[in-house]
């Protein structure tokens, strides 16, 4: 088996599973992109095997500490383990993330379940090569009627992979209506954002909605309206939602009608909306923006963006208002995000206390030693009157 030898002090020597290009001392056996390679230290000790791609900044991703090939039995076993974990954890098996990349030992593989449909992404060269085998294993293990390939994520560019959307097994289901936390959503597995719905925020909708009764709510970066819908159904006195994307605005309005709730929907840039002088006060403001950075090298700009966003939002918060805010970039550490939030609140001259932190649900598990698997950070803050 071809392979790589890593430099001293490489992260993989300390529990990480990735090998960056700068950490490779040398290669041997002429490894080919998409192949399984041996990963060794400078003393020729095997550290495990990983998938290889010289076109990616992450040249190797370890998926086993022992010698292991990628074959049908391997994929079936890993997917069975992923499904069993979620079932034992009490996850809702008809609406959840079935496979979450490195967190389930399948680097680059994402599989989301929407009733009878499974939506699959294979965002690494090796896994993309085996996508039909993976799809067959998913259908066999879950009993899904169809498996849809949604390989249109921008992360594929860094892997040198083409964009592709197709039905791998069964027939295209068309838009599906799903229910989550008492809220009905229309999901389009073939054309919706990402795989169709933000499954990682379903629990957060309920948490935030628990504070919405009797409050005027502003949901920023509303997307399909998850937070806005949950707050409206929970008894908010009014709900306003701001979203810039026309497709999302259309979906949001449709979901509001589907759930029989009144939401004031504004198609606008959130930063522009927040800085307008005629904005009213709100008792509950939700900030759930898309990732501000896809690269660690842009972290300073991202943190400035978070600081500015929270400074603007805090100025619209009522005396005893609540702010629920989220960051979905794994490049931004939790402490960095909290510091940016605190700086923004300071700019707005607002003192706030932390009510709770919100993390990823159990169907998006975090691997110790691999901080990149922990991307979702949430804070619920309450304004301190008289400060």
What is each residue range found by the language model?
Residues 238-243:
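Conserved SAM-binding motif I beta-strand of class I
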Residues 1-115:
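Non-catalytic accessory regions of SAM-dependent methyltransferases
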Residues 245-286:
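S-adenosyl-L-methionine
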Residues 99-112, 128-197, 206:
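Non-catalytic substrate-recognition/targeting regions of SAM-dependent transferases
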Residues 248, 283-312:
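Mobile active-site "lid"/loop adjacent to the S-adenosyl-L-methionine
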Residues 214-223:
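Conserved class I S-adenosyl-L-methionine
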Residues 281, 322-387:
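C-terminal catalytic and target-recognition region of SAM-dependent MTase-like enzymes
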